[in-house]
Amino acid sequence: MIVIAFDFGLKNIGVAVGENILKKGRALNKLSAKNGSPDWNNIKNLLKIWQPKFLVVGLPLNIDGTRQDITKKAEKFAFLLKYKFNIFVYLHDERLSTKEAKSLIFKKNGFKVLKKEKIHSVAAVIILESWFNQNLY
């Protein structure tokens, strides 16, 4: 079963695709956004190419589990995905995914490649793999 995950952001939205049997994700190109709103045609094309069974959207929360200002916008993004494309969307706790993504990129390639667009897509991989490991589908 193919699943696509999103690391929601106001300017960039990280994207990853994965398969539940392997429980592994692969980073795709990030999507540009304006105040959290992506080019919906780009998402439509992603869904057409990959034909996922589900979508997963990272839910940004504070370390103590409380909501952030961006939490509601991520929930709205998830709602719009479900509404526009008639596909089930899971919200998944993404606490520390960006920090973990930065650490992985830095360990692998050093500071020079620590670019924001890569961080979002690697964070989407972390969100997706975490979702695979915590769900029975």
From Swiss-Prot:
Function recorded in the entry: Could be a nuclease involved in processing of the 5'-end of pre-16S rRNA.
Keywords, in A-Z order: Cytoplasm, Hydrolase, Nuclease, Ribosome biogenesis
Major subcellular site: cytoplasm
Protein name listed in UniProt: Putative pre-16S rRNA nuclease
Subcellular localization: Cytoplasm
GO molecular function per UniProt: nuclease activity
Encoding gene (name): yqgF
EC primary class: hydrolase
SMART domains associated with the record: YqgFc
UniProt xrefs under Pfam families: RuvX
PANTHER family: POLYNUCLEOTIDYL TRANSFERASE, RIBONUCLEASE H-LIKE SUPERFAMILY PROTEIN
Domain of life: Bacteria
EC number: 3.1.-.-
UniProt record similarity statement: Belongs to the YqgF nuclease family.
InterPro entries attached to this UniProt entry: RNaseH-like_sf (IPR012337), YqgF (IPR005227), YqgF/RNaseH-like_dom (IPR006641), YqgF/RNaseH-like_dom_sf (IPR037027)
Any single biological process term in GO: rRNA 5'-end processing
One GO cellular component, as annotated: cytosol
